[in-house]
Amino acid sequence: VSPPTVIRAARAIGFTGFTELKIEIARARGTAQFFAPPEVLTADATLASVLETSIRAGVDALTALSGAIEISALDEAVDLIQSARQVFAFGAGPSATVAADAVFRLRTAGVITVSIQDYLSAMIAARLLGPGDVIIVVSSTGRTSSTLSIADAASSAGASLIAITNQYDTPLATLANVSLVVGGMPLPAQMAAAGSRLA
């Protein structure tokens, strides 16, 4: 079967293309719990319940990643980072911890990376980026307004934008030079950062 035929078939059943279809298939084959609503932790949750929910969020994130991530996009992101003059990372809310974790991991690999937590400082830094610079922007939804503003400013300044998100068809994924879609069900706020950090 030719690639154009596969793409047309994917579009005919409601997907934007083969990549989106592939991600949905990976999600479906992951676990039976994948389509169940994620458990929301309550104030009276037991320690065992918190532990089980945390482990399940991690397993689901890694299962989704195994079928969702595009190796070619990951290769492109690695190339951009390795050749970058400087690397910045930004995420808002729960995504800030994922961005900070990415910075830590890149630093341990010898890549000088900066995470800027507050919006104003991040906006100033984004506007000062230029060609040869990379900004990694993390957003589970790909629609957070502050994150999109930072991404747009960095992109307008000429920096390469790597998006880490859960969905393809978002403003952030559209704006990015490289989108690393890690897939997975949206998680409650308490679990979102933990699952995304693992992925």
Please place each PLM-identified region on the residue numbering.
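Short amphipathic alpha-helical segments, especially helix-boundary/capping motifs
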Residues: 35-40, 51-55, 79, 125-128, ...
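Short, charged beta->alpha transition segments
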Residues: 49, 72-77, 121-125
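HTH-adjacent hinge/linker in prokaryotic transcriptional regulators
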Residues: 3-73
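Glycine-rich phosphate-binding loops that contact phosphosugars or nucleotide phosphates
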Residues: 82-198
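Glycine-rich beta-alpha loop segments
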Residues: 67-85
